[in-house]
Every structure is written in C-alpha cells, then in structure tokens.
C-alpha cells in the first residue's frame, strides 16, 4: 500500500481543495407564468423567455 513520505502542508491541502466549493444554481423567474426555473432552460409548463415552446 502506498504511504506518503512527508506530511502535506496546509498550503498544498488548500490548493487541492480549491476546486471543491459548490456553486448555487442560477435561477430565473419566467415573466409570463411566474415560475422559477434554471437559467437558459424551459419551465415545467413549457415556457421559455415568455413564449410557449412546448404545447401539450
């Protein structure tokens, strides 16, 4: 089994963890239906940028 030779420093640990942070999802509110959705995605109703794009 691999065993480290030297203890990694706080700096190296921090550099490794620098990409581990989570980002919040960018949400938008549709101007017609008022529904919350992900940016650049359609709403559950089928609206995108105030227009009905999926008709059921």
From Swiss-Prot:
The keyword Oxidoreductase does not apply. Residues 1-26 are annotated as: Disordered. One of its GO terms (molecular function) is structural constituent of ribosome. InterPro entries: Ribosomal_bL32, Ribosomal_bL32_bact, Ribosomal_zn-bd. Keywords: Ribonucleoprotein, Ribosomal protein. GO terms for biological process: translation. GO terms for cellular component: large ribosomal subunit. The keyword Ribonucleoprotein applies. It holds the Pfam family Ribosomal_L32p. It comes from the Bacteria. Belongs to the bacterial ribosomal protein bL32 family. This is Large ribosomal subunit protein bL32. The lineage of its organism: Bacteria, Pseudomonadati, Pseudomonadota, Gammaproteobacteria, Enterobacterales.
């Amino acid at each position: 089994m691999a065993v480290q030779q030297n203890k990694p420093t706080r700096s190296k640990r921090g550099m490794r963890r620098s990409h581990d942070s989570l980002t919040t999802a960018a949400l938008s509110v549709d101007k017609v239906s008022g529904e919350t959705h992900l940016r650049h995605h359609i709403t559950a109703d089928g609206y995108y940028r105030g227009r009905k794009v999926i008709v059921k």
